[in-house]
């Protein structure tokens, strides 16, 4: 075996080990058991109520400035990720972790954080779905 052939084998082996190490360290951000239903696009409306949403790193803060309470609803983020919320009273503020929002495949939104290698996903649209076939209620997203 020539020196050149031996060098190629060593380089190929090092590359293979590198690929395996990188793949083994990658964290999968999905949980099939947490898979939800797809976003119901036919229920989307361009109407918003006076409920503000503020992003704070890996969480969102929702401030209900209305006199109306909302109970037992689904909160949608970016027309993809959803979390069920027990209630939001008039004047109430709630903080929710973005890591608790899942999509139809069980994937979680990339909320960011110190150890993340990718930039966090922006939160652009937040909506309340009061019931299974009820139209969406848009919230006011305050940009970061």
Predicted segment positions?
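Terminal connector regions
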Residues: 31-34, 102-144
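A short, sequence-level motif marking secondary-structure junctions
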Residues: 76, 88-91, 140-144
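Cysteine-centric segments in proteins
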Residues: 38-47, 54-55, 108-119
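Intrinsically disordered, low-complexity Pro/Gly/Ser/Thr-rich segments with frequent PxxP/GP/PP motifs
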Residues: 79-115
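A short, structured loop/turn motif at beta-sheet edges
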Residues: 65-68, 89-90, 130-133
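Sec-dependent bacterial lipoprotein signal peptides
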Residues: 1-27
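Bacterial Sec signal peptide processing site at the extreme N-terminus
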Residues: 19-42
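Short, surface-exposed binding/anchoring microloops in extracellular/periplasmic proteins
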Residues: 41-86
């Amino acid at each position: 075996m020539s020196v050149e052939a031996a060098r190629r084998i060593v380089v190929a082996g090092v590359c293979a080990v590198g690929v395996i190490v990188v793949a083994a360290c990658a964290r999968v951000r999905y949980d099939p058991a947490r898979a939800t239903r797809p976003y119901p696009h036919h229920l989307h409306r361009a109407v918003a109520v006076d409920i503000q949403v503020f992003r704070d790193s890996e969480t969102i803060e929702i401030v209900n400035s209305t006199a109306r309470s909302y109970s037992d609803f689904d909160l949608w983020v970016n027309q993809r990720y959803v979390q069920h919320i027990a209630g939001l009273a008039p004047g109430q503020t709630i903080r929710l972790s973005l890591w608790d929002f899942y999509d139809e495949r069980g994937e979680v939104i990339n909320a960011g954080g110190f150890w993340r290698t990718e930039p966090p996903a922006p939160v652009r649209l937040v909506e309340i779905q009061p019931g299974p076939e009820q139209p969406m209620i848009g919230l006011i997203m305050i940009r970061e």
